[in-house]
Amino acid sequence: MNAKILVIKVGQVETLTFSDGSQYESAIRKKVVPSVKIHSLGAEGNDVGLKKHHGGVDKALFFMSADSFNELNALLNKDFSLYGYCDIRRKFCRVRLE
């Protein structure tokens, strides 16, 4: 089986404001980049908001298969775009296993 990277997404920490006025620091909004350098702490240019639960050498990257991406859309009854912003947890890139 071979894996092919279809999309790479990275994000920076920003303050999100919810409808009730509460605010939250998160890097959940990811954008597509053409390439990225990978090191022991993850992808250059990608950050995480809750460092206690995300990131670090044991959680540096997150891969999601193409099938899982489609199943997640179906489960949530959403139509998240592969190439647009991503607001689902730490989704870093989508891969297709062949």
UniProtKB/Swiss-Prot annotation:
PROSITE patterns: MOSC. One of its GO terms (biological process) is toxin catabolic process. It comes from the Bacteria. Residues 30-98 form the MOSC domain. GO terms for molecular function: molybdenum ion binding; oxidoreductase activity; pyridoxal phosphate binding. GO terms for cellular component: cytosol. This is Uncharacterized protein HI_0279. It comes from Haemophilus influenzae (strain ATCC 51907 / DSM 11121 / KW20 / Rd).
